[in-house]
Curated annotation (Swiss-Prot):
Annotated GO MF terms: DNA binding
Organism: Pseudomonas fluorescens (strain Pf0-1)
Domain of life: Bacteria
Name assigned to this protein: Sugar fermentation stimulation protein homolog
InterPro entries associated with the record: SfsA, SfsA_C, SfsA_N
Family, per entry: Belongs to the SfsA family.
CDD domains assigned: SfsA-like_bacterial (cd22359)
PANTHER family in UniProt: SUGAR FERMENTATION STIMULATION PROTEIN A (PTHR30545:SF2)
Underlying gene: sfsA
Gene3D superfamilies referenced in this protein's UniProt entry, alphabetically: 2.40.50.580, 3.40.1350.60
Length: 237
């Protein structure tokens, strides 16, 4: 997935109210842009850090741009825009990059399902039956380690999705939790038990019920991003 039009560069002044970020472009222009990330962005955002953003010329938009990519204090790149994860995964599915999910004959997005009135990111249809795939974007990393973690803030919604997947697996339906790691320099993923114990417990319970857990890494630059490798999943940290 290439960024089109090309991203522009700037530096972060501050992020606030979750969805807003003040930046200064390389040309000295001060802008308030959209921050499309509901998480804490722990260990990612730093005042004065480099940012890359897409600019919109749509007069109906309230904000002139969207924060897409940033650089952590450790020099890693991360994708701010969590909405990119589903598009990346779909691109990888269609290209056959995610080997464990190859062979599907149909793909549907945002399908209603479950006991708690949820929507699954992807339902893949196979001759043997469907597979339900939930996608999460991961950006939380730590100094001196190549292990990323999820979530970066307490997420009841994320735990709910795991419960829904567990219900499917108990009924003999294939259910998959897929972590799309939008952070460079990562080799494995673990649940962030120190941030959300309930989510970590729900993940382990889901696995015990038969839910498959996959993690894939993204090759990321300010020009393009593409899923290119499988990562290890460390359920016990």
């Amino acid at each position: 997935m290439r960024f089109h039009p090309p991203l522009e560069e700037g530096r972060l002044i501050r992020r606030y109210k979750r969805f807003l970020a003040d930046i200064e472009t390389v040309g000295g222009e001060l802008l308030t842009i959209h921050c499309p990330n509901t998480g804490s962005m722990l260990n990612c955002q730093v005042e004065g850090g480099q940012v890359w953003f897409s600019r919109s010329n749509d007069p109906k938009r309230k904000l002139p741009g969207t924060w897409e990519v940033g650089e952590t204090p450790q020099g890693r790149l991360f994708c701010v825009n969590t909405g990119r994860a589903n598009a990346l995964v779909e691109e990888a599915l269609q290209a056959g990059v995610i080997n464990e999910l190859n062979g599907f004959t149909g793909l549907k997005r945002e399908v209603a399902y479950g006991q708690e009135k949820s929507r699954i990111d992807f339902r893949l249809d196979y001759p043997t039956g469907p597979a339900y795939v939930e996608v999460k974007s991961v950006t939380l990393g730590f100094d001196g380690t190549a292990v990323a973690a999820f979530p970066d803030a307490v997420t009841e919604r994320g735990a709910k999705h795991l419960r829904e997947l567990a219900h499917l697996a108990r009924d003999g339906i294939r259910a998959v939790q897929l972590y799309c790691v939008n952070l460079t320099g990562v080799e494995a993923v673990r649940p962030a038990e120190e941030i959300d114990f309930a989510y970590a417990a729900a993940l382990r319970e889901a696995v015990a019920c038969g839910v498959e857990v996959l993690a894939y890494g993204v090759r990321l630059s300010h020009e393009e991003m593409v899923i290119d490798r499988r990562l290890d999943v460390l359920l016990n940290g």
